[in-house]
Amino acid sequence: PTRRSSDLPLWEVVHLPEASDPDWTEYDVFEWNVYGSIQNMAENGVDVAHFKYIHGTANVPLGELRWGEWGRGADVFAKMGTPWGEVDGSICYDTMGPGQSWTRFGGISETLLVACITPVELDHVHVRFCFTQPKSQANGERAGVAKAIIRDICKQFDQDKVVWDRMKYEPNALICEGDGPIAQFRKFYARYYVSEGGDNNVTPLKAAG
């Protein structure tokens, strides 16, 4: 969006160096249609509790949130199970505006996921996941592990989709302390709507009850 129709965009599209690095693979693309709202999908990123109870991580991961003027992100660290035991994994995601999203996965096999999220209707979103990995990992002796990472990420999206396709947006949701900073996120996300005015004053989450 712009401040007025004649103005320049309010933010620039972020360049991802891996996307043009000859040492990284071409994109491997997967597509879905999600029958829910783009905001419900976005809130998934700050709902840290769901990683354990929906995706089966070994614990509820700790996230370090970042808030910018038009972008946001988080670094989530969690134990990940592998055939060689648990390893320290990282999931670092960032967004610019409501539609540009990318996630870097580390710990098992380096992976960059570029998510192209396009609202079709109020409760219909078309999603493309574009994956790239270092060629040395994707084609090396652990190529099977690299491919398994992509399969697992897509499996997790399928798990989330079961919820999103049945999820109603609740403007006055009852939030518990362990749910993640949903309140801060909603205040931040309001800046993307024409009829709503957001700002950078992100206040601490107050638990319900």
Per-segment meaning from a language model:
Residues 1-5:
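Short, small-residue-biased leader/transition segments that mark boundaries at the very start
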Residues 9-209:
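C-terminal catalytic domain of Rieske-type non-heme iron oxygenases
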